[in-house]
Curated annotation (Swiss-Prot):
Example GO biological process: transcription preinitiation complex assembly
Sections of the chain in a coiled coil: none
Function: Stabilizes TBP binding to an archaeal box-A promoter. Also responsible for recruiting RNA polymerase II to the pre-initiation complex (DNA-TBP-TFIIB).
Protein name: Transcription initiation factor IIB
Organism: Methanosphaera stadtmanae (strain ATCC 43021 / DSM 3091 / JCM 11832 / MCB-3)
One GO cellular component, as annotated: transcription preinitiation complex
Keywords noted in UniProt: Metal-binding, Repeat, Transcription, Transcription regulation, Zinc, Zinc-finger
CDD domains found in the cross-reference section: CYCLIN_TFIIB_archaea_like_rpt1, CYCLIN_TFIIB_archaea_like_rpt2
The Sequence repeat ranges on this chain: 128-211, 222-303
GO molecular function, one term: TBP-class protein binding
Family: Belongs to the TFIIB family.
InterPro entries cross-referenced by the UniProt entry: Cyclin-like_dom, Cyclin-like_sf, TFIIB, TFIIB_arc, TFIIB_CS, TFIIB_cyclin, Znf_TFIIB
Zinc finger (TFIIB-type) stretch: 11-42
Residues holding Zn(2+): C15, C18, C34, C37
Length: 311
């Protein structure tokens, strides 16, 4: 194999017909063509590069297969190694008893080296907390990555001092949910993060102000798929609810209204119209609002949009 590669490297760098050194490598056709006379010098060149394409540095890191991709959800970005707790070598054979004490010491020092400093200890604890909260909320990996970046930026800008790690993690998670359009309410974030809703909201406003994070208001439409899924409503009902919300937005009926309440009322109306009726209590429990809120939003939407729906 080495001889073949060496032979390929020694191939002529000029056209044997006209002597021109202006050679063109056409990788799509697998040919080397003379740019002067058009002679096809080689019609079977091999592309030694990867079979994938990457359009930026981050994509390249993720697609290369010479190691795990960089991730912001681990304090060292996944770049370090660790010694496995099982006392086996790379072939699966047990390590001799006389060497196990040495492996124990190596494993101990490896753990210390991976987390060597106050900042890394902070990140290690915070990111494990973030992973726990994300798992309980069922959030996708993209949200976890985004939340990890927000938290890291807060650490770099020294915004953690005087605030609880749990509170900053919860606020970062809330910001990431809004950025990725995977909405979760402050109540849901507070329930899993062991901090109050008030602290999460206050820390979120502080981070967005200090880190100059600009996030658009949450749309009621973003809540429809999740609420509909939990209520076992069909896709037709979801589409109808989104249609109702769009009409409400066009008529300015969502201004100053909580997005969860509007989404819940629209789903309730759509379920009644299409014969998949759910009780107000069921919808209210899923949306995290009161039945009174649903009735108020229901009344506004049906009257202003001229819908003939009976409770």
């Amino acid at each position: 194999m080495k001889e073949d590669v060496a032979e390929m490297e020694k191939k002529e760098t000029k056209c044997p017909e006209c002597g021109s050194t202006k050679l063109i490598n056409d990788h799509e056709r697998g040919e080397v063509v003379c740019g002067a006379c058009g002679l096809v010098i080689d019609d079977n060149i091999v592309d030694m590069g990867p079979e994938w394409r990457a359009f930026d540095h981050e994509q390249r890191d993720k697609r290369t297969r010479v190691g795990a991709p960089i991730t912001y959800t681990i304090h060292d970005k996944g770049l370090s190694t660790m010694i496995d707790w099982r006392n086996k070598d790379i072939y699966g054979r047990d390590i001799p008893a006389r060497n196990r004490a040495q492996w124990y010491r190596l494993r101990k020092w490896q753990r210390k080296i991976r987390i060597s400093g106050a900042t890394e200890r902070n990140l290690a604890f915070a990111l494990s907390e973030l992973d726990r909260d994300s798992s309980r909320l069922g959030l996708p990996r993209s949200v976890r990555e985004s939340a990890s970046v927000v938290y890291r930026n807060a650490v770099e800008n020294k915004l953690i001092r005087g605030r609880s790690i749990e509170g900053v993690v919860a606020a970062s998670l809330y910001a990431a949910c809004r950025r990725c359009k995977v909405p979760r309410t402050l109540d849901e974030i507070a329930d899993v993060s062991r901090v109050s809703k008030k602290e999460v909201g206050r820390t979120y406003r502080f981070l967005t102000r200090e880190l100059h994070i600009r996030l658009p208001p949450t749309s009621p439409i973003d809540y429809v798929p999740r609420f509909a899924s939990e209520l076992n409503l069909s896709g037709v009902v979801q589409s109808k609810a989104i249609e109702i919300i769009n009409q409400a937005m066009d008529n300015g009926l969502t201004s100053g209204r909580g997005p969860t309440g509007v989404a819940a009322a629209a789903l309730y109306i759509a379920s009644v119209l299409l014969g998949e009726r759910k009780t107000q209590r069921d919808v209210a429990d899923i949306a995290g609002v009161t039945e009174v809120t649903i009735r108020n939003r229901y009344k506004e939407l049906t009257e202003q949009l001229d819908m003939g729906v009976n409770l």
